[in-house]
Amino acid sequence: MLVSYKWLNEYVNLSNVTPQELADKMSVTGIEVEGVAVPEEGLKKIVVGEVKECVPHPNSDHLSICQVDIGEEELSQIVCGAPNVKAGIKVIVALPGSRIAGNQKIKKGKMRGEVSNGMICSLEELGYSDNVVPKAYAEGIYYLPQEAVNGTPVFPYLDMDDAIIELSITPNRADALSMRGVAYEVGAIYRQTPQFNDPELKEDASDNVENYVTVTVEDSQDAPAYQIRVIKDVTIAESPQWLQNRLMNEGIRPINNVVDVTNYILLLFGQPLHAFDYQKLDSKEILVRRATATEELITLDGETRQLTEENIVITNGKTPVGLAGVMGGANSEISQETTTVALEAALFNPLSIRKTSKQFNLRSESSSRFEKGINQATVGLACDVAAAMIAELANGTVVSGTAVGSEVAVKEAQVAVTLERINQYLGTALDEATVNEIFEALGFAYEVNQGAYEITIPPRRWDIAIEADIIEEVARIYGYDHLPSTLPSGETVAGSLTKAQHVTRQLKSLLEGHGTSEAISYALTTEEKSRQFMMKESQTTRLQWPMSEERSVLRMNLISGLLDDVAYNVARKNNNIAFYEVGRVFYQTEDPTKNLPTEENHLALALTGNTMVKDWQTKATAVDFYTVKGLVESIVAVLGLTEKISYQATTAIPEMHPGRTAWIYLEGEVVGFVGQVHPTTAKAYDIPETYVAELNLQQLVAIEAGGVTYEAVSKFPAVSRDIALLVDETVTNQELVKTISDNAGKYLKEIHLFDVYQGEKLGAGKKSMAYSLTFVNAEATLVDEEINRSMEKVEKALIEKHQVEVR
């Protein structure tokens, strides 16, 4: 937010405060100041000149020789290459020895044999950005107003002697995204009440808005407030110099005396407005509704936009004429032929505006304010002030009345707090008189009874809703630098790691030893990504004042963040990736507007590419399901939970491959999943085949693992038997291992799967799985009869339970 010191001085008295002092004071009261700039700094000897004579250069087809009055006895000859130079205009002249933008020094010289005593300048040569220069002067020099005095410094005529204070406004302080909002803030700091000199609205009582337009809002959730004023008999022209100066200093290009007023009101009130050419609407009906998937709109930038049902549009009853809150339509644009203006003021659904803005990549000052919040109490006032200004600057007449489609009931919030609570939080000893003065400076009405305050919050401060907000306001205006500093008190105890911290460090060391790298992703994400890879049902927890839609919802999984990291690396040709992350996810089962979410500590893995790169003696080995499952098994082993963990194939996670995904169970309860990211999901993230896992680390750590039991190595030999099974391809290894383990007897020591085969020889839907079973008796040598009995029981159980064929 750029704030003009001169403009601000019209509302609060800053005669005894320098711009830098003001910036410093604002910084210590809670609004960050990025810097203070004075446009004229670094420029010198640049004056007003009047072109008295202009003739073509004899040796050039694009240069002109000008005789310029710069307030001296004799005219000064200057050679100029601008296509729009002519006699009779007031111009910007850089004298010999002057400095223009870029610290460039201007010297007296010759151009094609003709003497040139300086330079006639464009706005760009004074440091203005191309984006703010009026289009009429984009390719040439700038014309100053005729009342400018020849030979005097040019800076006051362009308000380049103003100080521009750049503020960094956080999302919760969107009220400061307007000059009025900043004026209230500065007024509170210096104990002043801002005085606004709004122009008086004069209406033509003989004509009524009902003769021109009616407004209908299809769904008040989309547009809680919507109104139209009509200004007739306008004449489109350039805006006066003061208005152009203010817009250019705020980084906005002047267009004409109607559009410029809407931009001025945006800066003044923080209220976006839009002006339609009434004749081009070709209808007396304005309908605000959702677009259909078959509709298109050519916006003011000349682009054809394919609309969707997510978009709110302004229509003439039939076809769209504007993309609500984002950009108007070219079919209703203000032009030189416009004589009647339909002026729109509204509140639009911020979520819809954010989505539309993102969909079309159209970020604007208007859409940003709709997203962050607008003072609902001044929608009508902003429209009235704009109508009065348009009538004055364009010689028009405001038709009486306002066409209203929807209105919002403005409520003043009530917040209770006690003096004791304020002092307790801030560590202060403020008395009632001091706190009263602060509330009065802020413009907050209040009632106090023995230190108990009931405070009425004006609508312009919609960010204040709870006790903590009030305490923060007291701290800001009292001054953070005045809060007392105290040393920590209480007993000190020796620090130690909790079990969870100790286990987390163990696991990080384990995973890094396996070649993975730790990633740290944002806890805030989009609503769509927050709902991916979920292990249980939950509502989303949305921020009230998000910085952007990409960081608006608390995550409910870690994997989506890791996939963003994978995509970032893959885009930079880093193709072999193994990431892990330990972090919190947030589940909400209650009302997210009233209750905090439940936090769970999770661990996630994401692997893609090769685990082994090809060299002269090794073949490349790609990451697969068993790579990531092996890491999960290593984690479980460190936790001492191997015997309590089981896996079961699942198709319940839509973002995961239905044939390569498994739930992870801890004693029958889901604690995670492992598998391949669904190809469709991988394509959406623009990543190759990727394998992931996510575990509820908090739940795993909470389980008491069994103690480690050590036993001596048997002095009697172990016996191994192999068994090959022909089974249906749907039968899992885990099912077979469990059946073998349950029936092989007490001497079974180990089961090892050493071969899996599928092919045409086995028949469709079949696979061969070969196991090695190791038996040990620690007290005696095993004999064949014992082993044979165990193998017979195993074979019988496998045949009965899984219909296997023992090969």
Swiss-Prot record:
Gene3D superfamilies: 3.30.56.10, Bira Bifunctional Protein, Domain 2 (3.30.930.10), Ferrodoxin-fold anticodon-binding domain (3.30.70.380), Nucleic acid-binding proteins (2.40.50.140), Phenylalanyl-trna Synthetase, Chain B, domain 3 (3.50.40.10). Residues 40-155 form the tRNA-binding domain. One of its GO terms (molecular function) is phenylalanine-tRNA ligase activity. CDD domains: PheRS_beta_core, tRNA_bind_bactPheRS. PROSITE patterns: B5 (PS51483), FDX_ACB (PS51447), TRBD (PS50886). Signal peptide: none annotated. Its main location: cytoplasm. InterPro entries: aa-tRNA-synth_II/BPL/LPL (IPR045864), B3/B4_tRNA-bd (IPR005146), DNA-bd_dom_put_sf (IPR009061), Fdx_antiC-bd (IPR005121), Fdx_antiC-bd_sf (IPR036690), NA-bd_OB-fold (IPR012340), Phe-tRNA-ligase_IIc_bsu (IPR045060), Phe-tRNA-ligase_IIc_bsu_bact (IPR004532). Keywords: Aminoacyl-tRNA synthetase, ATP-binding, Cytoplasm, Ligase, Magnesium, Metal-binding, Nucleotide-binding, Protein biosynthesis, RNA-binding, tRNA-binding. Its cofactor is Mg(2+). It is found in: Cytoplasm. It catalyses: tRNA(Phe) + L-phenylalanine + ATP = L-phenylalanyl-tRNA(Phe) + AMP + diphosphate + H(+). Mg(2+) binds at residues 463, 469, 472-473. Residues 410-485 form the B5 domain. Binds 2 magnesium ions per tetramer. The keyword Endoplasmic reticulum does not apply. Residues 714-807 form the FDX-ACB domain. Its EC number is 6.1.1.20. The keyword Cytoplasm applies. GO terms for cellular component: phenylalanine-tRNA ligase complex. GO terms for biological process: phenylalanyl-tRNA aminoacylation. Belongs to the phenylalanyl-tRNA synthetase beta subunit family. Type 1 subfamily. Tetramer of two alpha and two beta subunits. NCBIfam families: pheT_bact, YtpR. This is Phenylalanine--tRNA ligase beta subunit. It comes from Enterococcus faecalis (strain ATCC 700802 / V583). The gene is pheT.
